């Protein structure tokens, strides 16, 4: 009886893994790259994200309590909260990939972990778009928007709308399973059986969550740069900070968000082709490229803290002072070779003088 039950369980397990195994057998890919690249990348991002967002939010709140909150500070604060919600889940993904893509934390935590990734992704895009519109209105239409851009009510209301809109976009994702039937794999998208219904949803959220905000952000910042270059009366510090912000946000979109959305859609389509029997080196390259872009997409949580430099003017001075303090402490604990040589030379001279005094005394 025990053998029969064991055989039944084994058959059930094999049948549950059949779709996954079939696609891997039809078009085998080297998953070793994923199992060392993503854990290493996620570990670095989690450490940088926790430190950067923690210090940045602390300084932003401390500064805002003294001088008062402004619209940009509210938007950046929401961006930091979205980053922290995501980076706290990265250690679980590190464990998942180091164990050979075996998820041991249960289906509920798998779904939450994947949800927080997409929540961070599209909340970051949403708030970066709001920041670009804020900069556009403040620089291109300064007189018309005087006072409106600095009050808190519009920025708070806008932040609430961004969160609500992101949750509405992600709501359909709850209907797609993230775990395989055996409860072993925790998919970042969904199981192979759901691809036909998942693809239209992903294409829709790519348009509403990324493409449209990307066009708005690019249009706003292109106009901002044109105005700043034409206007010679703009304060040089404001011009430099504004252009730095433009470059930073466009880098985030170009490096973190654009490649991910391109290769996520390509990877889903390649999985459909593989299920139909197709297999080529191009499909394998798409898979590897998609894994790289997943790491790049998470990198925005480590790069977003740079925006705190734009929202808090004294953060640079605080970080500089902190760096000098650390430098003095390190020099005290571990003096340089030149300092050690000088100290040894002084001691040698003092010893020689003492010896001469003793000789003279004798």
Model segments located where?
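Alpha-helical transmembrane segments of multi-pass membrane proteins
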Residues: 46-49, 78-90, 158-170, 206-214, ...
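Loop architecture of class A 7-transmembrane GPCRs
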Residues: 20-31, 97-118, 141, 147-154, ...
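First transmembrane helix
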Residues: 34-63, 215-221
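Alpha-helical membrane-protein architecture signal
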Residues: 33-40, 68, 73, 77, ...
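Intracellular effector-coupling site of seven-transmembrane GPCRs
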Residues: 81, 187-195, 206-210, 225-262, ...
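Intrinsically disordered regulatory tails of 7TM GPCRs
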Residues: 1-29, 274-279, 313-362
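Extracellular TM2-ECL1-early TM3 structural module of rhodopsin-like
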Residues: 34-42, 66-131, 138-141, 146-148
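Helix-to-loop junction signature of class
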Residues: 42, 46, 59, 85-101, ...
């Amino acid at each position: 009886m025990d053998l029969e039950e064991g055989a039944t369980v084994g058959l059930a397990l094999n049948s549950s893994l059949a779709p996954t195994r079939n696609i891997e057998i039809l078009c085998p890919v080297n998953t070793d790259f994923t199992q060392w690249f993503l854990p290493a990348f996620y570990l670095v991002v989690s450490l940088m994200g926790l430190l950067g967002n923690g210090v940045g939010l602390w300084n932003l709140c401390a500064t805002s309590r003294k001088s008062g909150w402004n619209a940009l500070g509210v938007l950046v604060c929401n961006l930091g909260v979205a980053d922290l919600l995501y980076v706290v889940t990265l250690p679980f993904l590190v464990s998942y990939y180091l164990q050979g893509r075996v998820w041991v934390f249960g289906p509920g935590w798998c779904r939450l972990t994947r949800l927080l990734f997409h929540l961070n992704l599209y909340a970051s895009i949403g708030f970066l778009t709001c920041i670009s519109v804020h900069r556009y209105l403040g620089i291109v239409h300064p007189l018309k928007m005087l006072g409106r851009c600095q009050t808190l009510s519009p920025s708070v209301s806008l932040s609430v709308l961004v969160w609500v809109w992101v949750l509405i976009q992600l709501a359909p994702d709850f209907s797609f399973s993230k775990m395989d039937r055996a409860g072993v794999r925790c998919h970042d998208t969904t199981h192979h059986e759901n691809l036909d219904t998942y693809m239209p949803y992903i294409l829709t959220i790519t348009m509403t969550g990324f493409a449209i905000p990307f066009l708005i952000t690019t249009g706003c910042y292109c106009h901002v740069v044109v105005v700043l270059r034409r206007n010679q009366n703009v304060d040089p510090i404001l011009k430099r900070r504004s252009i730095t912000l433009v470059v930073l946000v466009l880098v985030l979109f170009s490096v973190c968000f654009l490649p991910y959305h391109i290769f996520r859609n390509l990877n889903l389509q390649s999985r459909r082709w593989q299920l139909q029997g197709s297999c080529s080196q191009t499909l394998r390259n798409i898979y590897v490229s998609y894994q790289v872009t997943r790491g790049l997409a998470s990198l925005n949580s480590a790069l977003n803290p740079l925006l705190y430099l734009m929202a808090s003017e004294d953060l640079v001075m605080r970080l500089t002072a902190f760096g000098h303090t650390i430098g003095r402490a390190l020099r005290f604990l571990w003096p340089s070779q030149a300092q050690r040589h000088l100290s040894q030379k002084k001691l040698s001279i003092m010893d020689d003088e003492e010896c001469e005094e003793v000789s003279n005394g004798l």
